[in-house]
Amino acid sequence: AEGITITSQCIRVPVLNGHTATVFVKFRKNPTKEQLIEAMTSFKGAPQELGLPSAPKQFIQYLEEDNRPQVALDVDFEKGMGISVGRLREDSVYDWKFVGLSHNTVRGAAGGAVLCAELLKAKGYITKK
């Protein structure tokens, strides 16, 4: 998005699956919390628009609970291909901060690679010989 500044930090913790990131965001025009949640949860990228088999139907879910997302509870959202976001709060330096969770081996590796191949095929970059 135009005029957006983002910083983030990922801390590796001993869990079987899942990467958690704390993200700090600054906008030129500060949106409301409701606008941010709507933008995240309604986002659809090319994989969703093309209806690719490995694409999650809902790419990002927002969790209202103060202690979410959590690896044990949320890492398998959309069979591990979706992103869970929560703890959206105003920030005194940036405009907003939130926590994001993704499945590192499904979304980040194997499933992500399959989804990339599906997208390349759908866009005509991979064809039969």
Can you annotate each of these PLM segments?
Residues A1-D95:
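C-terminal substrate-binding/catalytic lobe of Rossmann-fold NAD(P)-dependent oxidoreductases
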Residues D95-K129:
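Generic C-terminus detector
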